Curated annotation (Swiss-Prot):
Its cofactor is Zn(2+). GO terms for molecular function: large ribosomal subunit rRNA binding; structural constituent of ribosome; zinc ion binding. Keywords: Metal-binding, Ribonucleoprotein, Ribosomal protein, RNA-binding, Zinc, Zinc-finger. The keyword Magnesium does not apply. GO terms for cellular component: ribonucleoprotein complex; ribosome. The keyword Zinc-finger applies. Binds 1 zinc ion per subunit. This is Large ribosomal subunit protein eL43. Gene3D superfamilies: 2.20.25.30. It comes from the Archaea. A zinc finger (C4-type) spans 41-62. Belongs to the eukaryotic ribosomal protein eL43 family. GO terms for biological process: translation.
Amino acid sequence: MVEFSHTKKIGSAGRFGPRYGRKIRVRLRDVEIKQNKEYKCPVCAFPKLKRAGTSIWVCDKCGAKIAGGAYTPETGAGKVVTKAIRRVIESKSREI
């Protein structure tokens, strides 16, 4: 009998077999896909940013270490704050 470490629908979460329920395994699959994906480095803009640990992201090219979200380098709240800061900077530059 051959055991698989993944399945077609659930992906890497197939290693749990029928345990824990389908919904949780699908959520786990989605999180694992996000955290193992390569992201663009904000310093050198090269797509080599990888997860080194919880909330720690390291660029393989320039060696930059960035603190981000647990599963993605930038969280939803971080994106909102970045946009707000950009708006403030733009409004100040228009006044001058």
